[in-house]
Amino acid sequence: MKVLSVSSEVFPLIKTGGLADVSGALPIALKAFGVETKTLLPGYPAVMKVIRDPVVRLEFADLLGEKATVLEVEHEGLDLLVLHAPAYYDRPGGPYLDPLGKDYPDNWRRFAALSLAAAEIAAGLLPGWQPDLVHTHDWQAALTSVYMRYYPTPELPSVLTIHNIAFQGQFGSEIFPGLRLPGHAFAIDGVEYYGTTGFLKGGLQTAHAITTVSPTYADEILTPEFGMGLEGVIATRIDNLHGIVNGIDTDIWNPATDPVVHTHYGPTTLKNRDENRRSIAEFFHLDNDDAPIFCVISRLTWQKGMDLVANVADEIVAMGGKLVVLGSGEAALEGALLASASRHPGRIGVSIGYNEPMSHLMQAGCDAIIIPSRFEPCGLTQLYGLRYGCVPIVARTGGLNDTVIDANHAALAAKVATGIQFSPVTETGLLQAIRRAMHFYADRKLWTQLQKQGMKSDVSWEKSAERYAALYSSLVSKGM
Protein backbone atom coordinates (compact mmCIF):
# COMPACT_ATOMS: atom_id res chain seq x y z
CA MET A 1 0.00 0.00 0.00
CA LYS A 2 1.19 3.50 -0.86
CA VAL A 3 0.41 6.36 1.54
CA LEU A 4 1.00 10.10 1.23
CA SER A 5 1.56 11.60 4.69
CA VAL A 6 1.26 15.38 5.01
CA SER A 7 2.69 17.23 8.01
CA SER A 8 3.99 20.70 8.84
CA GLU A 9 6.88 19.22 10.85
CA VAL A 10 8.80 15.95 10.79
CA PHE A 11 11.46 14.75 13.21
CA PRO A 12 14.45 14.84 12.90
CA LEU A 13 14.31 17.69 10.36
CA ILE A 14 12.03 20.17 12.11
CA LYS A 15 10.23 19.90 15.46
CA THR A 16 8.19 22.09 17.78
CA GLY A 17 6.19 19.32 19.47
CA GLY A 18 4.88 15.76 19.45
CA LEU A 19 3.44 16.14 15.94
CA ALA A 20 6.97 15.91 14.54
CA ASP A 21 7.72 12.76 16.52
CA VAL A 22 4.65 10.99 15.14
CA SER A 23 5.09 12.06 11.52
CA GLY A 24 8.74 11.04 11.68
CA ALA A 25 8.35 7.68 13.44
CA LEU A 26 5.07 6.30 12.09
CA PRO A 27 6.17 5.92 8.43
CA ILE A 28 9.20 3.91 9.51
CA ALA A 29 7.12 1.67 11.79
CA LEU A 30 4.55 1.11 9.02
CA LYS A 31 7.16 -0.48 6.75
CA ALA A 32 6.84 -3.72 8.74
CA PHE A 33 3.18 -3.87 7.66
CA GLY A 34 3.83 -3.37 3.96
CA VAL A 35 3.01 0.34 3.90
CA GLU A 36 5.19 2.57 1.71
CA THR A 37 4.94 6.20 2.84
CA LYS A 38 6.07 9.41 1.21
CA THR A 39 5.90 12.39 3.58
CA LEU A 40 5.21 15.89 2.26
CA LEU A 41 6.49 18.77 4.41
CA PRO A 42 7.40 22.44 3.88
CA GLY A 43 10.92 23.38 2.83
CA TYR A 44 11.83 25.51 5.85
CA PRO A 45 15.45 26.73 6.03
CA ALA A 46 16.20 24.08 8.67
CA VAL A 47 14.95 21.38 6.29
CA MET A 48 16.74 22.69 3.19
CA LYS A 49 19.96 22.89 5.18
CA VAL A 50 20.12 19.18 6.02
CA ILE A 51 18.73 17.38 2.97
CA ARG A 52 21.29 16.08 0.49
CA ASP A 53 20.99 15.58 -3.29
CA PRO A 54 17.23 16.09 -3.66
CA VAL A 55 15.58 15.29 -6.99
CA VAL A 56 13.05 17.67 -8.58
CA ARG A 57 9.80 15.70 -8.98
CA LEU A 58 7.14 18.32 -9.61
CA GLU A 59 6.91 22.05 -10.34
CA PHE A 60 4.07 24.48 -9.70
CA ALA A 61 4.04 27.72 -11.68
CA ASP A 62 1.22 29.08 -9.51
CA LEU A 63 0.62 27.46 -6.12
CA LEU A 64 -1.86 29.94 -4.65
CA GLY A 65 0.12 32.74 -6.24
CA GLU A 66 3.71 31.57 -5.82
CA LYS A 67 6.12 29.25 -7.59
CA ALA A 68 6.97 25.99 -5.86
CA THR A 69 8.91 22.80 -6.47
CA VAL A 70 8.48 19.36 -4.95
CA LEU A 71 11.83 17.75 -4.16
CA GLU A 72 12.21 14.07 -3.28
CA VAL A 73 14.96 12.92 -0.95
CA GLU A 74 15.70 10.09 1.48
CA HIS A 75 16.68 11.13 5.00
CA GLU A 76 17.30 8.75 7.90
CA GLY A 77 14.90 6.12 6.62
CA LEU A 78 12.19 8.58 5.57
CA ASP A 79 11.09 9.10 1.95
CA LEU A 80 10.45 12.84 1.90
CA LEU A 81 8.70 15.16 -0.52
CA VAL A 82 9.87 18.66 0.35
CA LEU A 83 7.71 21.56 -0.85
CA HIS A 84 10.36 24.11 -1.77
CA ALA A 85 8.55 27.44 -1.94
CA PRO A 86 10.86 30.22 -0.74
CA ALA A 87 8.09 32.83 -0.76
CA TYR A 88 6.21 30.77 1.81
CA TYR A 89 8.86 29.07 3.90
CA ASP A 90 12.26 30.74 3.51
CA ARG A 91 12.04 33.20 6.38
CA PRO A 92 13.52 33.68 9.86
CA GLY A 93 11.79 32.39 12.96
CA GLY A 94 10.12 29.02 13.38
CA PRO A 95 7.61 27.09 11.29
CA TYR A 96 4.67 29.18 12.50
CA LEU A 97 6.05 32.19 14.37
CA ASP A 98 8.25 35.11 13.38
CA PRO A 99 11.40 36.03 15.39
CA LEU A 100 9.20 38.09 17.76
CA GLY A 101 7.03 35.07 18.53
CA LYS A 102 4.00 36.23 16.56
CA ASP A 103 2.06 34.17 14.00
CA TYR A 104 3.05 34.89 10.42
CA PRO A 105 0.07 36.84 9.02
CA ASP A 106 -0.01 34.62 5.92
CA ASN A 107 -0.01 31.29 7.76
CA TRP A 108 -3.35 30.53 6.15
CA ARG A 109 -1.80 30.75 2.67
CA ARG A 110 1.42 28.95 3.65
CA PHE A 111 -0.42 25.86 4.86
CA ALA A 112 -3.21 26.00 2.31
CA ALA A 113 -0.40 25.75 -0.26
CA LEU A 114 0.92 22.65 1.50
CA SER A 115 -2.55 21.09 1.42
CA LEU A 116 -3.17 22.00 -2.21
CA ALA A 117 0.19 20.50 -3.23
CA ALA A 118 -0.78 17.33 -1.35
CA ALA A 119 -4.13 17.16 -3.14
CA GLU A 120 -2.38 17.54 -6.50
CA ILE A 121 -0.02 14.67 -5.62
CA ALA A 122 -3.02 12.61 -4.54
CA ALA A 123 -4.52 13.31 -7.96
CA GLY A 124 -1.53 11.64 -9.62
CA LEU A 125 0.62 14.63 -10.53
CA LEU A 126 3.80 13.04 -9.15
CA PRO A 127 5.23 11.07 -12.09
CA GLY A 128 5.36 7.32 -11.51
CA TRP A 129 3.72 7.31 -8.09
CA GLN A 130 0.06 7.20 -7.09
CA PRO A 131 -0.91 6.93 -3.41
CA ASP A 132 -3.72 4.66 -2.30
CA LEU A 133 -4.52 6.86 0.70
CA VAL A 134 -3.67 10.28 2.16
CA HIS A 135 -2.93 10.78 5.88
CA THR A 136 -2.90 14.39 7.09
CA HIS A 137 -1.87 15.81 10.46
CA ASP A 138 -3.46 18.73 12.34
CA TRP A 139 -4.89 21.96 10.95
CA GLN A 140 -1.83 22.77 8.87
CA ALA A 141 -2.58 19.84 6.53
CA ALA A 142 -6.33 19.51 7.13
CA LEU A 143 -7.37 21.34 3.95
CA THR A 144 -5.94 18.48 1.89
CA SER A 145 -9.16 16.46 2.12
CA VAL A 146 -11.15 19.64 1.41
CA TYR A 147 -9.25 20.19 -1.85
CA MET A 148 -9.64 16.49 -2.64
CA ARG A 149 -13.42 16.79 -2.27
CA TYR A 150 -13.88 19.91 -4.37
CA TYR A 151 -11.18 19.38 -6.99
CA PRO A 152 -11.54 16.59 -9.56
CA THR A 153 -9.29 13.87 -8.10
CA PRO A 154 -9.40 10.08 -7.89
CA GLU A 155 -11.65 8.77 -5.11
CA LEU A 156 -8.88 8.30 -2.57
CA PRO A 157 -9.59 7.72 1.13
CA SER A 158 -8.15 10.21 3.60
CA VAL A 159 -7.28 10.10 7.30
CA LEU A 160 -6.94 13.20 9.51
CA THR A 161 -5.10 12.91 12.82
CA ILE A 162 -5.83 15.45 15.57
CA HIS A 163 -2.75 15.87 17.75
CA ASN A 164 -4.19 18.79 19.74
CA ILE A 165 -7.63 20.19 19.02
CA ALA A 166 -6.73 23.46 20.73
CA PHE A 167 -4.95 24.43 17.49
CA GLN A 168 -7.62 24.78 14.81
CA GLY A 169 -6.32 27.05 12.05
CA GLN A 170 -9.20 29.50 12.26
CA PHE A 171 -9.06 32.59 10.04
CA GLY A 172 -11.36 35.37 8.90
CA SER A 173 -13.84 34.86 6.08
CA GLU A 174 -11.91 37.37 3.97
CA ILE A 175 -9.15 34.83 3.27
CA PHE A 176 -11.55 32.30 1.72
CA PRO A 177 -11.25 33.55 -1.89
CA GLY A 178 -7.48 33.15 -1.66
CA LEU A 179 -7.90 29.41 -1.08
CA ARG A 180 -9.28 29.01 -4.63
CA LEU A 181 -12.03 26.70 -3.47
CA PRO A 182 -15.49 26.89 -5.05
CA GLY A 183 -17.90 29.22 -3.30
CA HIS A 184 -20.09 26.39 -2.01
CA ALA A 185 -17.13 25.09 0.04
CA PHE A 186 -17.78 27.99 2.42
CA ALA A 187 -20.66 26.17 4.04
CA ILE A 188 -21.54 24.19 7.13
CA ASP A 189 -20.36 20.95 5.51
CA GLY A 190 -17.15 22.62 4.35
CA VAL A 191 -14.76 25.15 5.88
CA GLU A 192 -17.27 27.68 7.22
CA TYR A 193 -17.27 27.92 11.02
CA TYR A 194 -19.49 30.60 12.58
CA GLY A 195 -18.63 33.01 9.80
CA THR A 196 -14.90 32.23 9.82
CA THR A 197 -12.72 29.94 7.72
CA GLY A 198 -11.81 26.83 9.71
CA PHE A 199 -9.01 24.64 8.39
CA LEU A 200 -9.35 21.87 10.98
CA LYS A 201 -13.13 22.13 10.84
CA GLY A 202 -13.03 21.60 7.07
CA GLY A 203 -10.80 18.58 7.49
CA LEU A 204 -13.14 17.09 10.09
CA GLN A 205 -16.01 17.44 7.63
CA THR A 206 -14.24 15.90 4.66
CA ALA A 207 -11.73 13.26 5.85
CA HIS A 208 -13.00 9.69 5.59
CA ALA A 209 -11.55 8.77 8.99
CA ILE A 210 -10.45 10.85 11.97
CA THR A 211 -7.91 9.68 14.51
CA THR A 212 -6.69 11.13 17.76
CA VAL A 213 -3.56 10.14 19.62
CA SER A 214 -5.27 8.19 22.42
CA PRO A 215 -8.64 6.51 23.05
CA THR A 216 -9.40 8.67 26.09
CA TYR A 217 -8.71 11.85 24.13
CA ALA A 218 -11.08 10.61 21.41
CA ASP A 219 -13.80 10.44 24.08
CA GLU A 220 -12.81 13.75 25.66
CA ILE A 221 -13.04 15.83 22.47
CA LEU A 222 -16.70 14.89 22.21
CA THR A 223 -17.33 17.02 25.32
CA PRO A 224 -17.50 20.84 25.66
CA GLU A 225 -14.68 20.75 28.22
CA PHE A 226 -12.15 19.33 25.75
CA GLY A 227 -13.72 19.77 22.30
CA MET A 228 -12.78 23.45 22.08
CA GLY A 229 -15.98 24.28 20.20
CA LEU A 230 -15.66 21.47 17.66
CA GLU A 231 -17.33 18.77 19.76
CA GLY A 232 -20.55 19.14 17.77
CA VAL A 233 -18.77 18.61 14.46
CA ILE A 234 -16.88 15.61 15.83
CA ALA A 235 -20.11 14.11 17.20
CA THR A 236 -21.45 13.92 13.64
CA ARG A 237 -18.37 11.86 12.70
CA ILE A 238 -18.30 9.58 15.75
CA ASP A 239 -18.58 6.42 13.65
CA ASN A 240 -15.36 7.42 11.88
CA LEU A 241 -13.43 8.45 15.01
CA HIS A 242 -10.55 6.30 16.27
CA GLY A 243 -8.15 6.72 19.20
CA ILE A 244 -4.68 5.27 18.62
CA VAL A 245 -1.96 5.82 21.22
CA ASN A 246 1.41 7.11 20.03
CA GLY A 247 4.58 5.12 20.53
CA ILE A 248 8.19 6.18 20.99
CA ASP A 249 11.43 5.26 19.26
CA THR A 250 12.71 2.56 21.59
CA ASP A 251 16.12 2.58 19.92
CA ILE A 252 16.70 6.24 20.79
CA TRP A 253 15.02 5.89 24.19
CA ASN A 254 16.81 2.85 25.60
CA PRO A 255 18.50 3.03 29.03
CA ALA A 256 20.69 0.06 28.11
CA THR A 257 22.34 1.90 25.19
CA ASP A 258 21.49 5.63 25.52
CA PRO A 259 24.79 7.48 24.86
CA VAL A 260 23.98 10.37 27.23
CA VAL A 261 23.16 8.09 30.16
CA HIS A 262 26.25 7.85 32.35
CA THR A 263 25.58 4.30 33.55
CA HIS A 264 23.45 1.95 31.47
CA TYR A 265 20.93 -0.35 33.08
CA GLY A 266 17.84 -2.48 32.56
CA PRO A 267 15.00 -3.97 34.63
CA THR A 268 17.39 -6.42 36.32
CA THR A 269 20.17 -3.88 36.92
CA LEU A 270 18.27 -0.94 38.42
CA LYS A 271 21.04 -0.40 40.96
CA ASN A 272 23.06 1.10 38.10
CA ARG A 273 20.68 4.10 38.13
CA ASP A 274 22.46 5.33 41.27
CA GLU A 275 25.33 6.87 39.29
CA ASN A 276 22.88 8.73 37.07
CA ARG A 277 21.09 9.90 40.21
CA ARG A 278 24.33 11.37 41.54
CA SER A 279 24.86 13.18 38.21
CA ILE A 280 21.40 14.75 38.52
CA ALA A 281 22.18 15.88 42.07
CA GLU A 282 25.42 17.45 40.88
CA PHE A 283 23.85 19.26 37.91
CA PHE A 284 21.01 20.72 40.01
CA HIS A 285 23.17 21.30 43.12
CA LEU A 286 21.08 18.96 45.27
CA ASP A 287 22.04 17.35 48.55
CA ASN A 288 23.40 13.87 47.88
CA ASP A 289 21.08 11.78 50.05
CA ASP A 290 18.46 9.06 49.64
CA ALA A 291 15.42 11.35 49.47
CA PRO A 292 13.31 10.66 46.34
CA ILE A 293 13.95 13.00 43.43
CA PHE A 294 10.78 14.09 41.63
CA CYS A 295 11.33 15.64 38.21
CA VAL A 296 9.42 17.78 35.74
CA ILE A 297 10.39 17.95 32.05
CA SER A 298 7.84 20.17 30.38
CA ARG A 299 6.74 23.39 28.83
CA LEU A 300 6.02 25.60 31.82
CA THR A 301 2.40 26.46 31.04
CA TRP A 302 -1.02 26.37 32.67
CA GLN A 303 -2.16 23.61 30.31
CA LYS A 304 0.70 21.43 31.55
CA GLY A 305 -0.35 22.08 35.17
CA MET A 306 2.89 23.81 36.05
CA ASP A 307 1.12 26.26 38.35
CA LEU A 308 0.20 23.24 40.47
CA VAL A 309 3.84 22.15 40.64
CA ALA A 310 4.95 25.65 41.63
CA ASN A 311 2.30 25.78 44.36
CA VAL A 312 3.17 22.39 45.90
CA ALA A 313 6.98 22.67 45.63
CA ASP A 314 7.34 23.70 49.29
CA GLU A 315 5.15 20.77 50.35
CA ILE A 316 7.32 18.31 48.40
CA VAL A 317 10.32 19.45 50.40
CA ALA A 318 8.34 19.37 53.66
CA MET A 319 7.39 15.75 52.92
CA GLY A 320 11.06 14.86 52.53
CA GLY A 321 11.33 14.89 48.76
CA LYS A 322 13.44 16.79 46.26
CA LEU A 323 12.33 18.42 43.01
CA VAL A 324 14.14 19.21 39.75
CA VAL A 325 12.57 21.09 36.84
CA LEU A 326 13.70 21.38 33.21
CA GLY A 327 11.69 23.54 30.83
CA SER A 328 10.63 27.01 29.76
CA GLY A 329 7.37 28.80 29.18
CA GLU A 330 5.26 31.42 30.90
CA ALA A 331 7.41 34.01 32.67
CA ALA A 332 5.33 33.98 35.86
CA LEU A 333 5.68 30.22 36.22
CA GLU A 334 9.41 30.33 35.49
CA GLY A 335 9.76 32.97 38.21
CA ALA A 336 7.68 31.03 40.74
CA LEU A 337 9.73 27.86 40.24
CA LEU A 338 13.04 29.73 40.42
CA ALA A 339 11.85 31.36 43.65
CA SER A 340 11.09 27.94 45.13
CA ALA A 341 14.63 26.83 44.27
CA SER A 342 16.00 29.91 46.04
CA ARG A 343 13.94 29.08 49.14
CA HIS A 344 15.15 25.48 49.20
CA PRO A 345 18.80 25.21 48.07
CA GLY A 346 19.90 21.60 47.92
CA ARG A 347 16.29 20.38 47.72
CA ILE A 348 14.92 22.07 44.58
CA GLY A 349 16.78 22.71 41.32
CA VAL A 350 15.41 24.52 38.26
CA SER A 351 16.96 24.82 34.79
CA ILE A 352 15.13 27.18 32.43
CA GLY A 353 15.36 26.11 28.78
CA TYR A 354 15.35 22.79 27.02
CA ASN A 355 18.31 20.43 27.09
CA GLU A 356 17.72 17.17 25.18
CA PRO A 357 20.64 15.20 26.70
CA MET A 358 19.65 16.33 30.21
CA SER A 359 16.06 15.21 29.58
CA HIS A 360 17.39 11.70 28.94
CA LEU A 361 19.63 11.79 32.01
CA MET A 362 16.78 13.01 34.22
CA GLN A 363 14.63 10.06 33.15
CA ALA A 364 17.58 7.77 33.90
CA GLY A 365 18.41 9.24 37.31
CA CYS A 366 15.27 10.67 38.90
CA ASP A 367 12.86 8.49 40.83
CA ALA A 368 9.53 9.80 39.55
CA ILE A 369 8.30 12.22 36.90
CA ILE A 370 5.35 14.53 37.59
CA ILE A 371 2.95 15.18 34.67
CA PRO A 372 -0.09 17.12 35.97
CA SER A 373 -1.51 18.22 32.59
CA ARG A 374 -5.03 19.63 32.55
CA PHE A 375 -5.42 17.98 29.15
CA GLU A 376 -2.95 15.78 27.31
CA PRO A 377 -3.95 14.27 23.95
CA CYS A 378 -1.29 11.58 24.27
CA GLY A 379 1.91 12.68 25.94
CA LEU A 380 5.34 11.19 25.38
CA THR A 381 7.15 12.09 28.60
CA GLN A 382 5.30 9.43 30.59
CA LEU A 383 6.30 6.84 27.97
CA TYR A 384 9.94 7.83 28.38
CA GLY A 385 9.48 7.53 32.15
CA LEU A 386 8.07 4.02 31.84
CA ARG A 387 10.91 3.01 29.57
CA TYR A 388 13.55 4.38 31.98
CA GLY A 389 12.11 3.26 35.31
CA CYS A 390 11.23 6.83 36.30
CA VAL A 391 7.78 6.22 37.79
CA PRO A 392 5.13 8.48 36.20
CA ILE A 393 2.78 10.51 38.42
CA VAL A 394 0.09 11.63 35.99
CA ALA A 395 -3.23 13.43 35.79
CA ARG A 396 -6.07 11.08 34.83
CA THR A 397 -6.66 12.57 31.38
CA GLY A 398 -6.09 11.80 27.70
CA GLY A 399 -3.20 9.56 26.81
CA LEU A 400 -1.85 9.71 30.35
CA ASN A 401 -4.90 7.70 31.43
CA ASP A 402 -4.39 5.19 28.61
CA THR A 403 -0.68 4.52 29.13
CA VAL A 404 -0.11 4.52 32.91
CA ILE A 405 -1.73 1.85 35.12
CA ASP A 406 -2.52 3.32 38.53
CA ALA A 407 -1.00 1.66 41.59
CA ASN A 408 -4.32 0.93 43.27
CA HIS A 409 -4.75 -2.12 45.51
CA ALA A 410 -5.96 -4.40 42.70
CA ALA A 411 -3.22 -3.39 40.27
CA LEU A 412 -0.53 -3.75 42.93
CA ALA A 413 -1.84 -7.18 43.93
CA ALA A 414 -1.85 -8.28 40.29
CA LYS A 415 1.59 -6.74 39.80
CA VAL A 416 0.49 -4.74 36.74
CA ALA A 417 0.73 -1.18 38.18
CA THR A 418 3.17 1.11 36.37
CA GLY A 419 2.63 4.51 38.00
CA ILE A 420 0.30 6.80 39.91
CA GLN A 421 -2.77 8.57 38.53
CA PHE A 422 -4.65 11.41 40.21
CA SER A 423 -7.91 13.25 39.79
CA PRO A 424 -9.14 15.95 40.12
CA VAL A 425 -6.28 17.94 38.60
CA THR A 426 -5.84 20.27 41.56
CA GLU A 427 -3.16 21.05 44.12
CA THR A 428 -4.88 18.69 46.55
CA GLY A 429 -5.05 15.92 43.98
CA LEU A 430 -1.38 16.32 43.07
CA LEU A 431 -0.28 16.38 46.72
CA GLN A 432 -2.22 13.20 47.43
CA ALA A 433 -0.47 11.51 44.50
CA ILE A 434 2.95 12.65 45.74
CA ARG A 435 2.14 11.36 49.24
CA ARG A 436 1.27 8.00 47.69
CA ALA A 437 4.58 8.05 45.83
CA MET A 438 6.47 8.82 49.05
CA HIS A 439 4.69 5.90 50.75
CA PHE A 440 5.55 3.50 47.93
CA TYR A 441 9.14 4.78 47.77
CA ALA A 442 9.64 3.91 51.45
CA ASP A 443 8.92 0.27 50.53
CA ARG A 444 11.84 -0.33 48.17
CA LYS A 445 10.55 -3.74 47.09
CA LEU A 446 7.23 -2.20 46.05
CA TRP A 447 8.93 0.75 44.32
CA THR A 448 11.21 -1.60 42.38
CA GLN A 449 8.13 -3.58 41.32
CA LEU A 450 6.59 -0.38 39.90
CA GLN A 451 9.80 0.45 38.04
CA LYS A 452 10.21 -3.02 36.56
CA GLN A 453 6.60 -3.30 35.47
CA GLY A 454 6.81 0.09 33.79
CA MET A 455 9.98 -0.91 31.97
CA LYS A 456 8.19 -4.01 30.65
CA SER A 457 5.45 -1.87 29.08
CA ASP A 458 5.35 -1.99 25.29
CA VAL A 459 5.75 1.69 24.42
CA SER A 460 7.11 1.06 20.91
CA TRP A 461 5.38 2.06 17.69
CA GLU A 462 4.63 -1.54 16.67
CA LYS A 463 1.08 -1.84 18.07
CA SER A 464 0.15 1.67 16.97
CA ALA A 465 1.50 1.11 13.46
CA GLU A 466 -0.46 -2.14 13.22
CA ARG A 467 -3.67 -0.29 14.09
CA TYR A 468 -2.98 2.44 11.53
CA ALA A 469 -2.20 -0.17 8.87
CA ALA A 470 -5.48 -1.94 9.65
CA LEU A 471 -7.39 1.35 9.41
CA TYR A 472 -5.73 2.16 6.08
CA SER A 473 -6.60 -1.29 4.71
CA SER A 474 -10.23 -1.04 5.78
CA LEU A 475 -10.63 2.33 4.06
CA VAL A 476 -8.91 1.25 0.86
CA SER A 477 -10.88 -2.01 0.69
CA LYS A 478 -14.14 -0.07 1.04
CA GLY A 479 -13.11 2.10 -1.91
CA MET A 480 -13.76 5.25 0.06
From Swiss-Prot:
Its EC number is 2.4.1.21. Keywords: Glycogen biosynthesis, Glycosyltransferase, Transferase. It catalyses: [(1->4)-alpha-D-glucosyl](n) + ADP-alpha-D-glucose = [(1->4)-alpha-D-glucosyl](n+1) + ADP + H(+). Pathway: Glycan biosynthesis; glycogen biosynthesis. InterPro entries: Glyco_trans_1, GS/SS, Starch_synth_cat_dom. GO terms for biological process: glycogen biosynthetic process. Coiled coil: none annotated. It comes from the Bacteria. One of its GO terms (molecular function) is alpha-1,4-glucan glucosyltransferase (ADP-glucose donor) activity. It is an enzyme of class 2 (transferase). ADP-alpha-D-glucose binds at residue 15. One of its GO terms (cellular component) is cytosol. PANTHER family: ALPHA AMYLASE DOMAIN-CONTAINING PROTEIN, GRANULE-BOUND STARCH SYNTHASE 1, CHLOROPLASTIC/AMYLOPLASTIC. Belongs to the glycosyltransferase 1 family. Bacterial/plant glycogen synthase subfamily. Synthesizes alpha-1,4-glucan chains using ADP-glucose. This is Glycogen synthase. It comes from Rhizobium etli (strain CIAT 652).
